[in-house]
């Protein structure tokens, strides 16, 4: 065995291990002091990024079961039954820290990592989404300019990787707030399709079965990445570029095809991608799930650089790599497949019955430790929590505390925020139509949809989160993220089934941040129980903080739903002039956390808009059932900016004017953000039946106007349609490209 390390205190500090954790390590190793390889392994496996040691106690309460759930949390991705022997495999993950340091590679490898999570399960990826948060991009300050640079780099990275892989990026969300000036958020979602009896898991079992390495060679890129992502940033953080992985989408495409060919054989027991902590996490997770032991010979791992050490091989986060537990005697068959695809492949070890990880370097043992305490029994922290001091002041304010703004002036200002306007500059850099399963172009649906060629159905998916809501009410805001993502799916005509989440929060060592996180988890749990949409996969990203300033709580939710008829995917833009516009739901004059207060007065304050799960479910039922029988021509949820902004979006994208007169108590209520509302387009012949259906469900329904004309007129505010279109379609590009 290698010798124990010198300068122990400095080594522990560099590896983000506490003295208490070192005492645990000594206990696990029966009093033996670990060498540098073993310290590196403990550091990675017990990092926040890999162990979830601050968050696990709160995640355990999530609902994860339903008749349609095949695989819940704990595997590479979640799996749900979508009928006729088919399953959808999906997950959302973060690549926040790497993307802030190196936006192109950080975002690109985030896409690569989530794609591997999907095809590792045996599924072919068929759709990507992303949820992106940036700081303030408007203005001439260095921060504004750098944020614009980050936007350009992240979008380029996502597009470059996804396009090369031949996987369509069909939707997502982009928002901006100064709370992200020091930490942007890059959350990637991917979904794949697989036959429900052909799913592969990340396990290693069977004494004597070989352990095989496939994919790219191992280099030093990404060393310490998991530990870096488990710490907050300072002004010097850009020096961490060496911890950011470098992606090669062409190699990943070869790896995808090779793996899918491999899955057609019965030559393997399990397979795991090498993500955070690289070979370390893959090996420990595969063996930890089954109670097996492993022997691995690190000198047999394909190397990209000379002079690499066992420490480098175990902790490198080089991309496009997999670890396989094969059936003994089938090695050559596997080697032939990967060599055909011009990928590296090597037998590097075998499964044992020792329940220990034994690593060798040219015959010398460099690691010997029990697997379970490292992979399954990482220390769980019970961090202190405290309700944030800012909340009392924030929720005490109402819209009435501000000077009245002329409604026309407000309308023109609320049309132009980057979170409102069209994101064609973003999604036109993504290939959204490759594989020819995308039902409609991005921007024309509240949820992105793909057809399932095997059974005539369609899958709808939507990512959502309003960080302003989560700032003023961490529990309610998180619950509303689930509600709103489900509402978007329902607006497309699909029934929401399950979620994956990406929980982005600040420094867990701050009791106020930990309280926000705990409350957010409670909100997600409550909403998923009430809406019957279990959590099947997810990710936690903490330490999104720079110089003591944390991001807004941002629990991004991606909802997946099923439409039984791919020919009945409901658009969110107007279809025919002369049709009626029907508003479903109550407008209550609620402005807490609203775009109205943020854009006009620069603050995020107020009480969260009220919502009721039963009413929300009735709204979903109305839209889904009315769409089935052909009563609806389009549907859009009412959210940020109220009915005025929702109607303006529908008008701009469809290039059709509108004349609307909605019943409101106060003229500014056309901008309020009351929940459980939708705008439905209904032909004259179907209007009475639609109104009867709404009444039968106890939902308020009001015919508020007609489609047609050259103006967008909502109550007392109006603009020429061409002006609305110019603002909507050109603002984003003008802002982001102003430095070029």
From Swiss-Prot:
GO molecular function terms listed in the Swiss-Prot or TrEMBL record: ATP binding; magnesium ion binding; phosphoribosylformylglycinamidine synthase activity
EC code(s) of this entry: 6.3.5.3
Keyword field contains DNA repair: no
Binding positions for substrate per the UniProt entry: 94-97, 116, 245, 317-319, 541
Biological process annotations from GO: 'de novo' IMP biosynthetic process
Residues holding Mg(2+) 2: 117, 273
Entry keywords, A to Z: ATP-binding, Cytoplasm, Ligase, Magnesium, Metal-binding, Nucleotide-binding, Purine biosynthesis
Binding site for ATP: 52, 91, 501, 538
Domain of life: Bacteria
Pathway entry: Purine metabolism; IMP biosynthesis via de novo pathway; 5-amino-1-(5-phospho-D-ribosyl)imidazole from N(2)-formyl-N(1)-(5-phospho-D-ribosyl)glycinamide: step 1/2
The keyword Cell inner membrane appears for this protein: no
Entry binding sites for Mg(2+) 1: 93, 539
Compartments where found: Cytoplasm
One family name in Pfam for this protein: AIRS_C
Family: Belongs to the FGAMS family.
Protein name, entry field: Phosphoribosylformylglycinamidine synthase subunit PurL
């Amino acid at each position: 065995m290698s010798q124990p390390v010198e300068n122990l205190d400095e080594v522990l500090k560099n590896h983000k291990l506490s003295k208490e954790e070192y005492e645990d390590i000594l206990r696990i190793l029966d009093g033996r002091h670990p060498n540098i390889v073993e310290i590196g392994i403990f550091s990675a496996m017990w990092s926040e990024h890999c162990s979830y040691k601050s968050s696990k106690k709160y995640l355990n309460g999530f609902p994860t079961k339903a008749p349609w759930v095949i695989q819940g949390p704990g595997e590479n991705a979640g799996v749900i039954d979508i009928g006729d022997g088919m399953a959808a495999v999906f997950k959302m993950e973060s690549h926040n820290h790497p993307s802030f340091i190196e936006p192109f590679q950080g975002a690109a490898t985030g896409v690569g990592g989530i794609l591997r999570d999907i095809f590792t399960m045996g599924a072919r990826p068929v759709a990507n989404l992303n949820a992106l948060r940036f700081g303030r991009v408007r203005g001439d300050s260095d921060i504004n300019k750098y944020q614009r640079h980050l936007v350009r780099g992240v979008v380029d990275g996502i597009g470059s990787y996804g396009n090369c892989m031949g996987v369509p990026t069909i939707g997502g969300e982009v928002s901006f707030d100064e709370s992200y000036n020091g930490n942007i958020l890059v959350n990637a979602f991917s979904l794949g399709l697989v036959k429900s009896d052909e799913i592969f898991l990340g396990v290693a079992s069977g004494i004597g079965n070989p352990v095989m390495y496939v994919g790219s060679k191992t280099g030093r890129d990404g060393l310490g990445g998991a530990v870096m992502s488990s710490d907050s940033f300072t002004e010097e953080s850009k020096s961490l570029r060496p911890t950011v992985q470098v992606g090669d989408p062409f190699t990943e495409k070869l790896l995808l095809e090779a793996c899918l060919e491999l899955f057609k054989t019965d030559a393997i027991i399990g397979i795991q991608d090498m993500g955070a902590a690289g070979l370390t996490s893959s090996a420990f997770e595969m063996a930890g799930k089954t109670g097996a032991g492993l022997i691995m010979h690190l000198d047999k791992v394909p190397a990209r650089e000379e002079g690499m050490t066992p420490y480098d091989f175990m902790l490198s986060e080089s991309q496009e790599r997999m670890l396989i537990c094969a059936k003994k005697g089938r090695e050559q068959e596997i080697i032939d497949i990967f060599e055909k695809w011009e990928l590296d492949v090597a037998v590097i070890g075998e499964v044992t019955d020792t329940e220990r990880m034994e690593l060798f370097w040219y015959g010398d043992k460099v690691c010997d430790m029990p697997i379970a305490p490292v992979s399954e029994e990482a220390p769980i922290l019970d961090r202190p929590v405290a309700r944030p001091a800012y909340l009392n002041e924030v929720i005490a304010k109402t819209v009435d505390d501000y000077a009245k703004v002329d409604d026309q002036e407000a309308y023109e200002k609320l049309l132009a925020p980057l979170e409102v306007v069209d994101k064609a500059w973003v999604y036109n850099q993504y290939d959204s139509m490759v594989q020819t399963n995308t039902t409609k172009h991005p921007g024309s649906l509240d949820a992105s949809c793909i057809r399932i060629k095997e059974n005539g159905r369609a899958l709808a998916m939507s990512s959502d989160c309003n960080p302003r809501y989560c700032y003023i009410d961490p529990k309610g805001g998180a619950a509303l993220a689930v509600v709103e993502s489900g509402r978007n799916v329902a607006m497309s005509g699909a029934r929401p089934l399950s979620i994956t989440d990406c929980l982005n929060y600040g420094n867990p060592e701050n009791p106020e941040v930990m309280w926000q996180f705990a409350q957010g988890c409670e909100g997600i749990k409550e909403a998923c129980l009430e809406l019957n949409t279990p959590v099947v996969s997810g990710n936690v990203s903490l330490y999104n903080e720079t110089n003591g300033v944390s991001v807004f709580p941002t629990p991004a939710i991606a909802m997946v739903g099923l439409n039984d008829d791919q020919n009945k995917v409901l658009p969110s833009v107007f279809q025919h002039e002369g049709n009626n516009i029907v508003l479903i739901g109550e407008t209550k004059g609620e402005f807490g956390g609203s775009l109205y207060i943020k854009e006009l007065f620069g603050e995020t304050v107020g009480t969260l808009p009220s919502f009721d799960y039963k009413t929300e479910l009735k709204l979903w039922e109305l839209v889904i059932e009315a769409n089935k029988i052909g009563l609806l021509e389009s549907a859009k949820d009412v959210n940020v900016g109220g009915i005025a902004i929702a109607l303006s979006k529908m008008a701009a994208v469809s290039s059709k004017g509108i004349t609307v007169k909605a019943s409101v108590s106060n003229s500014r209520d056309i901008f309020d953000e009351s929940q459980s509302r939708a705008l439905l387009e209904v032909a004259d012949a179907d209007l009475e039946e639609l109104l009867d259906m709404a009444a039968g469900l106890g939902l308020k329904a009001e015919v508020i106007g007609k489609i047609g004309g050259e103006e967008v007129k909502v109550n007392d505010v109006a603009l020429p349609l061409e002006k609305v279109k110019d603002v909507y379609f050109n603002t984003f590009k003008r802002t982001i490209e102003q430095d070029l």
